[in-house]
């Protein structure tokens, strides 16, 4: 059952789903992302990761409009340490290669500096394959 987060206009900006078959959480970010929305969404994602004792996150930014640089510092300094402490080990981030969101994702990856296994993908199937390979190696 997905969790939908909506903005002040009633539009869904994030759909979070736990995928029990693959044992990962899937975040589908949609549209322009505000700082408050990113913080709320990232925290909601942490809850689902914790509830399912999940170490794998598939984060999809292909439908994001514009950059989200305004939240990168918070993600690196606040969210990531809590996610790692909660057991998150692998973060697959799917972006449209030429988008401003891709630039923000690269900034996030640099900020994390190896604290978390994070890779950027332009193809969601490649991201899923990477997470599945990580799961096989972990068992």
Task: List each model region and its residues.
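Amphipathic, Lys/Arg-enriched alpha-helical "gate/interface" segment within cytosolic domains
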Residues: 1-139
């Amino acid at each position: 059952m997905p969790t939908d987060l909506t903005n002040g206009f009633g539009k869904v900006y994030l759909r979070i789903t736990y995928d029990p078959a693959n044992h990962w959480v899937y975040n589908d970010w949609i549209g322009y992302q505000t700082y408050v929305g990113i913080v709320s969404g990232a925290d909601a994602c942490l809850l689902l990761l914790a509830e399912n004792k999940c170490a794998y996150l598939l984060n999809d930014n292909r439908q994001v409009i514009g950059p989200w640089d305004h939240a990168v510092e918070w993600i690196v300094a606040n969210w990531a340490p809590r996610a790692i402490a909660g057991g998150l080990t692998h973060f697959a981030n799917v972006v449209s290669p030429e988008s401003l969101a891709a630039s923000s994702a690269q900034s996030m990856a640099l900020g994390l500096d190896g604290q978390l296994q994070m890779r950027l993908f332009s193809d969601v199937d490649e991201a899923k394959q990477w997470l599945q390979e990580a799961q096989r190696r972990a068992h």
